[in-house]
Design a protein with these regions (language model features):
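Short, surface-exposed ligand- or partner-binding patches at beta-edge/loop junctions that are enriched
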Residues: 106-119
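Interdomain boundary/hinge segments at the C-termini of tandem beta-sandwich modules
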Residues: 129-131
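Extracellular and select intracellular beta-sandwich modules with Ser/Thr-enriched
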Residues: 123-126
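Edge beta-strand plus adjacent loop/short-helix module at the start
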Residues: 1-104, 117
Length: 132
């Protein structure tokens, strides 16, 4: 066994809840293709958010500049022994994660989130996130 503070995330105050719909066939997130001029998520440093990620097909999902624990996969709570910090998760159908924002970013140096599959990322399955 190893020591981690990941378990404490389950008791965190949730600043916001967001839902993301991944259309794997068309490379879209929430029916939108990546636009480098559009900020998709604005979050605050030091907060925790619940992200619910639904996918049309199994796909990897990653977040830059933040870490998270998986709360549930396909509506089944994750066992306490599986709680660990992650930056990428495999989404079969639905994943619920608790995202902790500790690193700031800006309009000139934003973070990206979205598909960890590079072909899907090239199709536009990415979003821009600013953390301040």
């Amino acid at each position: 066994s190893f020591n981690t503070d990941a378990m404490a995330m389950l008791k965190s105050k949730i600043a916001q809840e967001r839902t993301f719909e991944l259309d794997v066939t068309n490379g879209l997130i929430n029916k939108q293709r990546f636009d480098p001029r559009r900020v998709d998520v604005s979050a605050k440093v030091g907060t925790v958010e619940r992200w619910i990620i639904n996918s049309s097909l199994p796909v990897g999902f990653t977040i830059q500049g933040a870490k998270f624990v998986i709360e549930s996969q396909d509506d089944v709570n994750v066992d306490a022994s599986e709680l660990a910090w992650k930056d990428t998760v495999w989404v079969k159908k639905k994943v619920q994660i608790l995202v902790k924002f500790e690193q700031p970013s800006s309009n000139t140096h934003p973070f990206l989130f979205g598909s960890s599959n590079l072909m899907l990322a090239d199709m536009g399955s990415l979003g821009i996130m600013i953390v301040q």
